[in-house]
């Protein structure tokens, strides 16, 4: 991904125009048995967001896509892993980092070719103002993922001690957090 961008962006900067769409994966949001893949794919999102801010002044938009579909790679996931993921997902509480939105779409909707028009659109003139975003393109759906941002913070003058944090975090920053994988009893 880096090398492709490195070699193409030089001409885009000279032209003061360009569109870059990078393929990430919703696995980057957390997927059992794929920590290495998840880290690499979510790294693409960080790369994309950084590029978007760096290249904005040159008229270059940069976005990431979580493409989906039934592929040889998804077909190669062992049934035991699928069962484990399903069991883990059913135990998760308060998270919205699941796969793309479910629908009642027919099997042909999961053809990866359905990603193409959505990705091509991001390269068009009307999409030029869209930059630094992450889109999901599974099936016939298209989703916009929210950017990460600070939701809560705590402050004090000076450094925190572990004891202070132990007292304040449970009633402040961690107050509404739920463990997505609670201990089995």
Residue ranges and their predicted role:
Residues 3-8, 47-48, 118-122:
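Hydrophobic positions on the long internal alpha-helix
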């Amino acid at each position: 991904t880096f090398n492709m961008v490195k070699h193409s962006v030089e001409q885009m900067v000279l032209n003061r125009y360009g569109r870059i769409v990078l393929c990430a994966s919703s696995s980057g949001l957390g997927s059992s048995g794929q920590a290495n893949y998840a880290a690499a794919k979510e790294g693409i999102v960080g790369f994309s967001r950084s590029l978007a801010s760096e290249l904005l002044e040159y008229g270059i938009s940069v976005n990431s896509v979580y493409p989906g579909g039934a592929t040889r790679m998804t077909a190669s996931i062992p049934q035991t892993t699928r069962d484990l993921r399903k069991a883990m997902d059913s135990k998760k509480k308060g998270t919205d980092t699941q796969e793309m939105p479910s629908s009642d779409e027919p099997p042909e909707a999961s053809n990866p070719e359905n990603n193409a028009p959505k990705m091509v659109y991001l390269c068009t003139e009307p999409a030029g103002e869209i930059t630094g975003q992450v889109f999901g393109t599974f099936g016939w759906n298209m989703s916009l993922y929210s950017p990460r941002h600070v939701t809560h913070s705590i402050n004090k003058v000076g450094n925190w001690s572990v004891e202070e944090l132990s007292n304040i975090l449970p009633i402040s920053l961690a107050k509404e957090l739920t463990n997505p994988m609670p201990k089995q009893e």
